[in-house]
Amino acid sequence: IQIEKSIHDYMVNSISYDYEALRNKSMNRCSFNIYGVINNRLAVCEGIAKFVKLTLNKLGIECFICGGKCTLENEKIEDHAWNIIKIEEDYYHIDVTWDIRKDDAQNKRIVSYDYFNLDDANISRDHFDFNMSFECTSMLYNYHAIMGRFISGKKQLIQLLSDGLALGKNFSFRIKRTINTPDNIDDIVVETFNESVKYNGTNGKQYYLSANKSQLTYYVTVG
């Protein structure tokens, strides 16, 4: 997991998404392969997925490229590529591209883990039409599950926010989606966050909450 996370974090911190390449592929072919990542630090999903696969394979970790489609925040549908990694006996989706494209509530780049080791059910919230010969059914090695920030109830959310705000550092968490998850869960999270900030005090700091509503992941930043 640590090797995978190191590669993920390097990419998120160092590589920018090449929006221009989507408009003019013939003039930006490097962004569709590993060259764009290594030499230009600029790539689209195809180049990023190829780099992740090559690097993990070189380190002896089983990793594949998964092709499909994705739904953007503006509801536009695009062709997309990401990775599937094998950890122990289970397979997980990891989409470094969509973690690279994540900003916080102040439009600053953050190290996001929204798409770090997801099962089929969670990745399918905004990725679809992918066809692999195996299923991804586990969330055991999801980033937020490992960090103890995979929230399954309001009491746990209140405690996490209280502990996180007390530290005064940026942190993220994921809400566990079940058949009992209310439709207004995002409103509940925002309300609980505001109550926690008010109750715990700000210590002269500003706290911001950004959300990936399709994945029910949230990022708290300190201003």
Regions found by a protein language model. Give the residues of each.
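Hydrophobic/aromatic-rich core segments of domains that either
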Residues: G47-N122
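Secondary-structure boundary elements
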Residues: I1-V37
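Low-complexity, Gly/Ser/Thr/Pro-rich intrinsically disordered linker/tail segments
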Residues: A105-K213, T217-T221
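Extracytoplasmic/periplasmic, Sec-exported soluble proteins
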Residues: Q2-I3, N40-I48, E75
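Acidic/polar residues at beta-strand termini and the immediately following turn/coil
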Residues: D18, D95, S210-S214
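Acidic, metal-dependent phosphodiester-chemistry machinery of nucleic-acid enzymes
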Residues: Y35-N39, Y218-G223
